């Protein structure tokens, strides 16, 4: 549940705490007055800008590419999709004053995307109403325009699937402002910055008009600290961001009906949401399987691709050396496939 300070109530409470011990029993303070204080130095500062996010699949769409000729073709898998992203802001510890206090902020957050172990930078733009605990949600649309060349073998069909992954993260935010008192209200000391005053009967000195300055607010709540002249109030907010992180195109290759051939799956390079960064398939990490990596140095032909054959019986009958696939790697992929 949100916490809310009220400067007027806190000023009255601080005055009671300070003057209370000196009030003659049986009497009640009179002529209570809240002076025209000022608010300034309104600041918003993120508490953390580095996040680790586990991505989740947000959207996928597929298209088929056909090659019914006897020669390999280069075709293009093209996608143009848009996804809605949200930024929700909630004040968790706010303050009420005589005026509306709000501030806008823009900052860059760095997000470590787990599974691909890459960091992207995103700009978060928000606005905070210090006196409202209502969650404010803004939406934007991000476009994903992908055009990837794909080699389609003879008499084959290739299914290209665009997969868009998103992630959520929450930015803790620190809010602060200063409370300035009104000067010229205290007789004999016109420079005293009065915030609140009341008249009471002092047990020893009789009738007294007692003024307090903004720094006294710390007596009412630990949300305030004193700098000797003003009170500095500190609060909190949260900003929850849900946005696209990266996209990847999965390629499923299979022979057309009535033709023999290999069936395989592989991934095209990843596109991060800050689109200037393109990742090669080998950087996807263990969470997204790469079906056609480059063999290690123990293979007979170092630059030969490893192909996973989904037809397991044909796969077992093949001569791995002739296909340029290492025995140990072929056995490993066979075991991995059996587990699926």
Curated annotation (Swiss-Prot):
Record's keyword annotation contains rRNA-binding: no
CDD domains: PFM_Cry51Aa-like
Region (Disordered): 318-340
Protein function: Promotes colloidosmotic lysis by binding to the midgut epithelial cells of lepidopteran larvae.
Any GO BP annotation: sporulation resulting in formation of a cellular spore
GO molecular function, a single term: toxin activity
UniProt keyword annotations, A-Z: Plasmid, Sporulation, Toxin, Virulence
Entry annotated with the keyword Cell inner membrane: no
Protein's recorded name: Pesticidal crystal protein Cry15Aa
